[in-house]
Amino acid sequence: MIFMILTKFEKARIIGARALQIAMGAPVIIDISPDIIDPIDIAMIEFENNVIPITIKRNQ
């Protein structure tokens, strides 16, 4: 697996898009404690664990 270095803008876009998906009812991919209910916090945890199913395609 290739790990890309993301810019802060790409990171914000990925976390924001995933948080929106979670807020709209998408299933959470990882197990989290029941007291974490904020979609942004959940998306950040998923991002840190590298499990967000979103890919980045850059134009070169």
Curated annotation (Swiss-Prot):
Subcellular location field: Cytoplasm
One GO CC term, this protein: DNA-directed RNA polymerase complex
One Pfam family recorded for the sequence: RNA_pol_Rpb6
Substrates-to-products reaction catalysed: RNA(n) + a ribonucleoside 5'-triphosphate = RNA(n+1) + diphosphate
EC number: 2.7.7.6
Keywords for the protein's UniProt record, in alphabetical order: Cytoplasm, DNA-directed RNA polymerase, Nucleotidyltransferase, Transcription, Transferase
Main location: cytoplasm
GO biological process: transcription by RNA polymerase I; transcription by RNA polymerase II; tRNA transcription by RNA polymerase III
Complexes and interactors: Part of the RNA polymerase complex.
Main function: DNA-dependent RNA polymerase (RNAP) catalyzes the transcription of DNA into RNA using the four ribonucleoside triphosphates as substrates.
Similarity comment: family membership: Belongs to the archaeal Rpo6/eukaryotic RPB6 RNA polymerase subunit family.
Protein name as annotated: DNA-directed RNA polymerase subunit Rpo6
Organism: Picrophilus torridus (strain ATCC 700027 / DSM 9790 / JCM 10055 / NBRC 100828 / KAW 2/3)
Name of the coding gene: rpo6
